[in-house]
Amino acid sequence: MNSARPTIVESSTLAEPMNADVDGLLLFDAGCPFCRRSVRWFLARERRDSRVAIVGLETPLGERLGRHFGFDPSDGDSIRYLTAGRCHRDSEALWRLCERLDGSWGALARMQKVPRPLRDGIYRFVGRHRSRLAPSDDARLEGHPRWIDRLTQAHCRHLELPLSLAGEAPV
């Protein structure tokens, strides 16, 4: 049996930098190896017509979005998924992201049929134990082509967010 960790290969379509065609924004705990691995898994299986950008919850942009949507990004207790002017969290964010998966992986979005208290309970259980679910040496994502440090006015228009959230990159 091979003891080497499996490698998640990123699609060559992700090689270009994130442009204004963003149609979703995934905020996650960038310090969590399980979260980083999960984001890589998602991006490797995302449909070609889906353009989700990624950002860490505890970055200046994550904090600004937290203030706007009324959540504390330092909690890091849940992913957030922004699209069409709305902020989704927990299992709702997860099934909405699953709708963007390619091929039969998209069937995971059917989890929305499970009663929300049950699916959120499972989501939170995994979240409490996530530190044991991935090796701590998983590479960071800050340099990934889908990572953004700021929202442009074009991003805000595509995501249906107020233009006031657009701003300069942090110094």
What are these regions (language model features)?
Residues 2, 48, 73:
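Long C-terminal interaction/binding lobes of large macromolecular proteins
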Residues 2-12:
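N-terminal leader/targeting and pre-domain segments
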Residues 13-48:
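Local sequence-structure signature of Cys/Sec-based thiol-disulfide redox active-site neighborhoods
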Residues 28, 55, 112:
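Active-site-adjacent beta-strand anchor residues
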Residues 49-63:
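Thiol-based oxidoreductase modules, predominantly thioredoxin-like and allied folds used
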Residues 60-171:
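Thiol/selenol-based redox catalytic cores and closely related redox-interacting motifs
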